[in-house]
């Protein structure tokens, strides 16, 4: 279990920041592997299911966080590599908090030539895409919670996860990771 205390300091009272490689559990099918890409961009690393030529079915990453106060107004921000949509319709992932309803998010379908100046070029220059998913009506109570991410398309590269409950700290890559400890079982 990772201790991601939202009450550790004023900076983290309303959000939890996790590097992608700090997952609690990973699942992958035979012939695929979750691969850490060290020093990718301005984060600790990137994380992707490889090889990209294999199906992504059955793969997932689960993150754990221990909260010391109740948090509501949950919004998860995933910082992803700026992969252009080489798959018709773009790249998608599924995301779920605890045992709640899974949400499907397409994060790059609008990176097309029709949007080259407003969407595609800015994403390429920033080298990242910020994908936001809201969980209306969800309150995270004191204790351990899980966040599960399933790729629905190949070539998704995850940099950072930000569980934001009103902290609204600006920034993506420059946010310092929340304090953490690993408990070995």
Protein language model annotation of sequence segments:
Residues 17, 22-24, 64-66, 137-139, ...:
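Generic structural detector for well-ordered beta-strands
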Residues 36-50, 173-185:
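Short, surface-exposed polybasic-and-hydrophobic patches located at secondary-structure transitions
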Residues 1-8, 12:
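Single conserved hydrophobic/aromatic residue that forms the stacking wall/gate
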Residues 155-184:
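Exposed low-complexity, polar/acidic, P/S/T/G-rich flexible segments that act as propeptides
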Residues 56-58, 81-166:
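Beta-strand-rich ligand-recognition modules
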